C-alpha cells in the first residue's frame, strides 16, 4: 500500500496538541482561492522550479529523460510541458532549485518515519497529524496508518476540509483521536465561489462527526473580502453552537506568503493582493463566535 504525499514535517506545533509530526498528502477536492499549499491541490506530480536558486550547473540537463531542461545563453530554461515528473533532476540539483511534489511512500516507510519522534510525543502530549491536500482522498492508507499508530499508543489527528463522503470518515473514526476541521464559509453559494464547491456536505459531515464524541478543533481561514463580515461570522458561530464536542475554534489569519510557490509551479495565484487581517479583526471574530457558547481564539494567540 502506498500514498501520494508532498512532505513530512517534524516538530509541528500548530497541527494539534503537543509536538507532532505531520504527513501532508497530495490532492484536494477543493481549490481555495487563498490556498497556502498550492503544491497540494493537484493529484498529479509537479516539479517546482526556483530560478533564483539555480546555479547553472547543468546536472539536470544531463539526467532528464524528457529533455525538459536546457542551459543556454539566457541561463536555465525549464520546459514544463515536457516534464514527466520522474524527479531525477531534483536528486542531482546542486542549488536546491528543483523540488518534486507528489512522491510515493509505503505504509511501512511512513510509519517508521512517524515513529522516530515517539519520545517527543510522549513527553509533550503530541502525536501524528495527517493533512494535505485532503488526506481522506486516500482514506484506506490513513486507516491503515492510524491503526498501526494507535496500536502503539500514538495520538492521531486528522486535518480535513470535510468535502468527502462520510463513508470515508467511517473508515478512520475508530483510530482517530482528534479532528482538525475546516469551516470556510456558512453561505453555500459564497463558499462555492471561494473554493469551487458548495458547503452542504461539509456542514453535514461536521454534525455527524460531532456525534461520534471525538474532539474537534474548528479552523476558520479568515480571509478579508471572503468571510470577514459580521453576518458570516455570526452565521458560523450559530451553526457551530449545535456541536457538543468542539474543543475550540481557531480563527486563522490569511497570509500571502505562498506567492513564490505559485510562481515556482507556474500556477495562477488567485488571491495575490489581499492583506492579512489585523489582530483586532481576529479578536473581534473570536469574540463573536465565543458569544454563541463555543470557545474561539485568534490563530495568532494560540
Q: Predicted segments — roles?
A:
Residues 2-17, 211, 224-302:
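Auxiliary Fe-S-binding modules of radical SAM enzymes
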Residues 5-59, 76-85:
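N-terminal pre-triad scaffold of radical SAM enzymes
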Residues 15-17, 24-25, 41-42, 46-47, ...:
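N-terminal-biased segments
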Residues 33-40, 59-78, 88-104:
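Iron-sulfur cluster-binding cysteine motifs and their immediate structural context
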Residues 67, 96, 151-152, 212, ...:
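Conserved dinucleotide-binding and phosphotransfer motif residues
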Residues 108-264:
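Conserved AdoMet/S-adenosylmethionine-binding subsite of the radical SAM
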